């Protein structure tokens, strides 16, 4: 009787655990998979720039440069059509290897790859996640808030690239059917 009761408890515990999305000790933290707008201070060697960055989804990014003054107003868009650069009404397909076009591509690829980061390449200290990835651009290290998934920094030593993110806001849009405003997550 005791064996039957023990077996029933063991089987029901296993079944209940199997219904959960993930086990508590193997759960991957949520990183930056949301659509959002943020400011980015970008430095690459002696070059530096600031941009308002909008992520609309994987592979769909916009970098609106605000500094230096030579780039102010230039918008680099990454999407299905490739890389385009525009200034006002003038829009051109950008040379992907140009430095100010290459940097947004590295940043976008690195952030889009965060959900695929292996668990052994993720560490945490004081609520800050550090994620390390290898890609064609070399080793990339990203830090993010564990609680929100908001990006803090991105570094790619091979390209001498460092990015500091700030003022991260979830992208807000209006519903097409009503005038209600909702946050896209």
Please provide the spans of the model-predicted regions.
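A short, compositionally biased
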Residues: 36, 78-81, 126, 146-148
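Residue-level detector of beta-strand structural context in well-folded domains
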Residues: 40, 51-52, 74, 83, ...
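Gly/Pro-enriched, hydrophobic low-complexity segments
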Residues: 62-67, 118-185
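N-terminal leader/targeting segments and the immediate start of mature chains
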Residues: 10-60, 70, 94, 168-185
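Positively charged n-region of N-terminal signal peptides that target proteins for export
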Residues: 1-5
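Hydrophobic/aromatic beta-strand elements that line small-molecule binding cavities or substrate pockets
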Residues: 50-55, 76, 140-144, 165
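Flexible, processing/modification-adjacent segments and terminal tails
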Residues: 29-31, 36, 40-42, 85-138
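An acidic-aromatic
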Residues: 53-113, 159-162
